[in-house]
Amino acid sequence: MKTIWCFAMLAMVFLATGICAAEVPNLLGKWTGSWSAYDEGIGYSNLTENGSFILTFVEQEDRIFAGNMTFKPENEAEGGKGFAGAIGLDNKTLYFVEFDKGYTLGTIISNDEIELIYLADGENGSVAIDRLYRIKA
């Protein structure tokens, strides 16, 4: 009986270790995709074939990351800004702060696909949903 108990305890330790040791996703690199948005004073918009959006994860140390994004809506000047964020304990949830304004919450759908929801409050409030795919080198 003691032997069975010892094996059961040993098996539980190994299983618990495997569960806790989930690998942190590597987000480094460039991602592109589409967006739909609503901006106060402008209304609804989305990415067209003449626009572009590139999100680049430049640095990542464990669950903390930083990078920059460039976007060019159709018939508008190109813009860019930096961001930093963290991956949640579930290794699926993303939290960003964009350096000029706003916050982004996201979900890692797969190694090569993420969805982001951007929120900015105040006088020029806006919301956007982005579906991004990793650009393969």
Per-segment meaning from a language model:
Residues 43-82:
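N-terminal glycine/threonine-rich, aromatic-flanked beta-hairpin/loop signature
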Residues 7-16:
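Bacterial N-terminal signal peptides
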